[in-house]
Amino acid sequence: MVTIGNAHNDLIHDAVLDYYGKRLATCSSDKSINIFDIDGTESYKLVSTLTGHDGPVWQVSWAHPKFGSILASCSFDGKALIWKEQPETQQWSIIAEHSVHQASVNSVSWAPHELGAVLLCASSDGKVSVVDFNDDGTTSHVVFDAHAIGANSASWAPLSSTPSPNQKDAASLKQQRRFVTCGSDNLAKIWKYDAANNTYVEEARLEGHTDWVRDVAWSPSMLVRTYIATASQDRTVLIWTQDKAGKWQKQLLTEDKFPDVCWRCSWSLSGNILAVSGGDNKVSLWKENLQGKWESAGEVVQ
């Protein structure tokens, strides 16, 4: 396990490996983003520090490598910034600024790469925005109301299957856009693209928490069924699955409440292990057994 000490001068809010697992991006209340080269399991090197935000940086998200070396970040300053590394110089620069929100942008997430360079943002102004970065260098965005008191996180659904040749045109792919958001209204909501009105409409409402939902994560792979995890201020994590009739069913990850607030939840790439971090300074790992119950798979003490 690689442990990076003194990575920032203030609280670290996110740490994300790139597609190949070779580079780590971290962000902090010190308003900066650090890029580390990770070599194996023991060594690392700080290669870049990115500054451009005017407030704490909450989250970072790597784009798929087919778009180049691109990173999105979001901040309390109400902006999402898009950074690109020039391969010749290995220098990073801001190539786009998304500033449509009126409050802190709490979450940024790139869509599955088959859908194009599309960024999803969730903000404390209660709105969610979806930004398309078009091939001709232009951008277009859709902004809509999602959670009345504030949107805290958002996560894309995986594509249900590999599109057939006649589904690969832009219009058909756009129809497959789905994501889940969560907010300070104690809810998570699933949204789908509405082509007729060029916006996103609520497909399902996931009710089960009794306090703010801090994070939501849609399992990245389609196994026997699809999973959504929600982590809440109420010290519980819920696992949501869709039954044959299309209705979403909830299950407590564990019958006992967590010792403190559940801040974040994250699926493994294969979608079969869930990591949960909370106010108790621990990261716990969970997996589903053959009986459909979730059981502990270990923990990492910070």
Curated annotation (Swiss-Prot):
The COPII coat is composed of at least 5 proteins: the SEC23/24 complex, the SEC13/31 complex, and the protein SAR1. Component of the nuclear pore complex (NPC). NPC constitutes the exclusive means of nucleocytoplasmic transport. NPCs allow the passive diffusion of ions and small molecules and the active, nuclear transport receptor-mediated bidirectional transport of macromolecules such as proteins, RNAs, ribonucleoparticles (RNPs), and ribosomal subunits across the nuclear envelope. Due to its 8-fold rotational symmetry, all subunits are present with 8 copies or multiples thereof. This is Protein transport protein SEC13. InterPro entries: Sec13/Seh1_fam, WD40/YVTN_repeat-like_dom_sf, WD40_repeat_dom_sf, WD40_rpt. Component of the coat protein complex II (COPII) which promotes the formation of transport vesicles from the endoplasmic reticulum (ER). The coat has two main functions, the physical deformation of the endoplasmic reticulum membrane into vesicles and the selection of cargo molecules. It also functions as a component of the nuclear pore complex (NPC). NPC components, collectively referred to as nucleoporins (NUPs), can play the role of both NPC structural components and of docking or interaction partners for transiently associated nuclear transport factors. It comes from Scheffersomyces stipitis (strain ATCC 58785 / CBS 6054 / NBRC 10063 / NRRL Y-11545) (Yeast). GO terms for molecular function: structural molecule activity. It is found in: Cytoplasmic vesicle, COPII-coated vesicle membrane; Endoplasmic reticulum membrane; Nucleus, Nuclear pore complex. WD repeats lie at residues 7-46, 52-93, 100-141, 162-201, 208-250, 257-296. The keyword Lipoprotein does not apply. Its main location: membrane. Belongs to the WD repeat SEC13 family. GO terms for cellular component: COPII vesicle coat; endoplasmic reticulum membrane; GATOR2 complex; nuclear pore outer ring. Pfam families: WD40. It is a peripheral membrane protein.
